[in-house]
C-alpha cells in the first residue's frame, strides 16, 4: 500500500528541526557571548580577598589569592562565584606611590557561565592609585580611543566594595574599571597577538599615525613600540598588516595625576606634557589625520562633559587641555615645532632610507 505524503507533517518536522537548530545556535552563542563589555551601565559588586597580603606583596611575580566576587543580577538575585586575585603592574604596585595596587582577577569559566562575566577568563581591574577621579578620567580616555578604532580595548566601569578577608573588614568602596582581555580584542578583529621585535615602520601606517597623534592629544608619552611598553601589537588575519593597540593612559597630561609629576619641573611643562613620538609623515598625511581628529572633537567633548563622576572643575580642565591640541594643529608654526621638528626617522632606528 502506497503511503501518502503529507505536506503539513513534513513542514512541521522541518519547523521543529529548524527551531531546535536555532535554540542550539543561541545556546552556543550565549556561551561565547561577551556580555560584560556590551553595556556602559555602571553596576556595583563586592570583591573579597586577602587584600592585606595582596597590598604587601611586592614580589616580581605576585601570588594569587582566593577570593569571591558578589553582585546583584538585574532580577535582584545574588550572584556569587570564586575568583583568584593578585596584584599586577610595576610602578603602581609601589606602596609609597599608590595606596592600593591594580589587580588581575582570574575567573573560572564554568562558574561565570550565564552571568555578566560569561566567557571571561582573566581581566585587569584598574583601581584608584590616589584620587578616585583619576580612574574615571582614564576610563574616559579608553572610551575616547574606542571612537578612533574598533582595534581598541573595551572597558566597563564598576563600583567596587573591596573587603579584606584577613581583617574581616571593608577596605573601601571605589570606582574601578575592567579592561577587555587582548584575546577578545583579537577575536573581534580577526587578528592575533604578536610578540616579536618591531619598529614603528613595520606597523600599518595609518594605524600608527592615529595612535601616535592620539597619544599626543592626551599628553601621554609613557609608551614605546620597540619595547612594547603600554602597546600590544596584533597581526590582522585579513590584511596581514601589524596594528598597535595602546593601553595604560594614567600618565596622560589630560589626567595630570599627582603621582605622575616629576619633581623640580616647571608647571608649564606639567601643564602640557605633550611629546609627539610618531614618524615623519608627509604634510598631507598629517593633514588627513588631523581632519580625522577634528571630526571626533565633538564626540570627545561629549564623553568628557557627560561624565558626571568627574567634578565640573576637572571636566573644564580636561576640555581646556583637549582644546589645546586643536589650537596646536591649526597653527603652522606650532605644528612645525610640535610635530615636524621632533618626528622620528628611519635613521633613528638604524634603518636604510627608502
Description of each model-found segment:
Residues 1-31:
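Bacterial Sec-dependent N-terminal signal peptides
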Residues 31-354:
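Phosphate/dinucleotide-binding and metal-coordinating scaffold of catalytic cores
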Amino acid at each position: 500500500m502506497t503511503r501518502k505524503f503529507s505536506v503539513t507533517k513534513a513542514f512541521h518536522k522541518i519547523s521543529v528541526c529548524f527551531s531546535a537548530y536555532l535554540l542550539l545556535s543561541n545556546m552556543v552563542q550565549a556561551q561565547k557571548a561577551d556580555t560584560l563589555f556590551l553595556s556602559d551601565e555602571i553596576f556595583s559588586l563586592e570583591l573579597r580577598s586577602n587584600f592585606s597580603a595582596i597590598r604587601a606583596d611586592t614580589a616580581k611575580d605576585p601570588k594569587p589569592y582566593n577570593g569571591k566576587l558578589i553582585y546583584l543580577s538585574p532580577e535582584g538575585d545574588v550572584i556569587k562565584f570564586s575568583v583568584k586575585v593578585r596584584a599586577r603592574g610595576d610602578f603602581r604596585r609601589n606602596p609609597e606611590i599608590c595606596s592600593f595596587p591594580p589587580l588581575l582577577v582570574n575567573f573560572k569559566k564554568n562558574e561565570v557561565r550565564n552571568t555578566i562575566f560569561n566567557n571571561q577568563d582573566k581581566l585587569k581591574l584598574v583601581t584608584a592609585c590616589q584620587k578616585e577621579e583619576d580612574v574615571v578620567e582614564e576610563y574616559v580616555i579608553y572610551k575616547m580611543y574606542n571612537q578612533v578604532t574598533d582595534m581598541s580595548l573595551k572597558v566597563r566601569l564598576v563600583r567596587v566594595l573591596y573587603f579584606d578577608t584577613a581583617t574581616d573588614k571593608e577596605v573601601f568602596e571605589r570606582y574601578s574599571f575592567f579592561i577587555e582581555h587582548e584575546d577578545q580584542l583579537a577575536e573581534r578583529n580577526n587578528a592575533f597577538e604578536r610578540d616579536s621585535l618591531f619598529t614603528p615602520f613595520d606597523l600599518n601606517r595609518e594605524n600608527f599615525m592615529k595612535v601616535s597623534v592620539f597619544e599626543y592629544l592626551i599628553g601621554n608619552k609613557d609608551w614605546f613600540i620597540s619595547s612594547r611598553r603600554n602597546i600590544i601589537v596584533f597581526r590582522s588575519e585579513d590584511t596581514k598588516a601589524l596594528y598597535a593597540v595602546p593601553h595604560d593612559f594614567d600618565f596622560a597630561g589630560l589626567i595630570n595625576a599627582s603621582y605622575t609629576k616629576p619633581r623640580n619641573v616647571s608647571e608649564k611643562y606639567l601643564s602640557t606634557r605633550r611629546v609627539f613620538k610618531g614618524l615623519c609623515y608627509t604634510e598631507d598625511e598629517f593633514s588627513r589625520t588631523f581632519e580625522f581628529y577634528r571630526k571626533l572633537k565633538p564626540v570627545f567633548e561629549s564623553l568628557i562633559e557627560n561624565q558626571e563622576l568627574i567634578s565640573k572643575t576637572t571636566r573644564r580642565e580636561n576640555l581646556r587641555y583637549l582644546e589645546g591640541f586643536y589650537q596646536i594643529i591649526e597653527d603652522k608654526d606650532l605644528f612645525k615645532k610640535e610635530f615636524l621638528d621632533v618626528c622620528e626617522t628611519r635613521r633613528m632606528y638604524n634603518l636604510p632610507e627608502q
